[in-house]
Amino acid sequence: RICDTAIVYTITLETNDTMKLTGFADEASRDLATQIKATKELGWTAISARMIGDRNIHEMPEADFEKAADQLDEAGIVIPELGSLIANWGKTIDSDFGIALGEIERCIPRMQRLGTKMVRVMSYAQNPWGEDQNETERFRRLREIVKRFADAGLTTVHENCMNWGGFSSEHSLRLVEEVPGLKLVFDTGNPVFQRDRSKPQADGTFPWQDAFEFWKAVREHVIHIHVKDCQNPISDDVE
């Protein structure tokens, strides 16, 4: 632990059946020097990058990014995954798609500078259940997102979170079906606090998602895993 905060660790699944450990070092600190220190204390050489200071890597001023990239190089730390803000749970499907396109434009050269091959995206925020989820537009946007990264030789992975693909394992699998080239990052903690919208009950309710069942359903499409310690919600009316 650094700064009384633990790093959430992640796993990259390699094609030769090996696993490489990395972590969300911004869970330890937003300060890059402390992120590097925390990573090295664990004996790791990789960070799953999101925030440095108060900004995501693809939103940092150019001079600040170059300084950070040099620090990482000097420390011998690599970045296998960039956790972007693209189409994340904080953006609705009716938001301007130009926002995502701008993020992609800034993200690609920074991934290339860092030698990062994998970018984490989402499928936009969940609309309240029962309302139109605008699936067609979600698929259209994600196809364009994946294509732009693929054209640069980069792999796009979708995380099951508070987004459309996080409604259930069936929703995540539908994304893979509808969006050629899309891979998955599986988060072990996110199913715990969400209802499984693929399993309506007779009384109109939905059961809590089962993380292990979710994993078994999507595993053949997963190339990266977020491992979290998580508790079930304390009340059935809290999601």
Role assignments for model-derived ranges:
Residues 9, 30-33, 37, 41, ...:
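Active-site acidic/histidine proton-transfer and metal-coordination neighborhood
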Residues 20-25, 47-49, 79-84, 119-121, ...:
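Hydrophobic faces of well-ordered beta-strands that scaffold small-molecule active sites
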Residues 32-35, 63-68, 209-213:
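Alpha-helical scaffolding within the catalytic cores
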Residues 48-69, 125-129:
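Glycine-rich, proline-tolerant flexible connector loops at the mouths of alpha/beta enzymes
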Residues 52, 87, 124, 189, ...:
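Flexible loop residues that form catalytic
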Residues 82, 146-239:
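Acidic/histidine-rich catalytic cores of soluble enzymes
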